[in-house]
């Protein structure tokens, strides 16, 4: 399951993202955040973290540095 989400993000990064202007207000970008979240936390928590991050990506949020939480914080 995790590999399917990672494949979707990589497809977006390779084929869709280059055709759009850079607009992400966060570092790392939302797609890189999603990759790291899925690789670190697996499919369910990775999906939840990525969804929360994408919902924060709007003009009224200041953005900035927002790393994926460490695996030890899963408890």
Swiss-Prot record:
Alphabetized InterPro entries for the sequence: Membr_insert_effic_factor_YidD (IPR002696)
Assigned keywords, A-Z: Cell membrane, Membrane
Primary localization class, coarse: membrane
Subcellular location field: Cell membrane
Membrane topology: Peripheral membrane protein
Any one of the GO CC terms: plasma membrane
Taxonomy, superkingdom: Bacteria
Family indicated by similarity: Belongs to the UPF0161 family.
Function: Could be involved in insertion of integral membrane proteins into the membrane.
Identification of the protein by name: Putative membrane protein insertion efficiency factor
Protein source organism: Bacillus cytotoxicus (strain DSM 22905 / CIP 110041 / 391-98 / NVH 391-98)
């Amino acid at each position: 399951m995790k590999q399917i989400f990672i494949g979707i993000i990589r497809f977006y990064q390779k084929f869709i993202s280059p055709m759009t202007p850079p607009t992400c207000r966060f570092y790392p970008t939302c797609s890189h955040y999603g990759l790291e979240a899925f690789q670190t936390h697996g499919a369910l928590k990775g999906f939840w973290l990525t969804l929360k991050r994408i919902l924060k990506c709007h003009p009224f949020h200041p953005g900035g540095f927002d790393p994926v939480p460490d695996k030890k914080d899963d408890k």
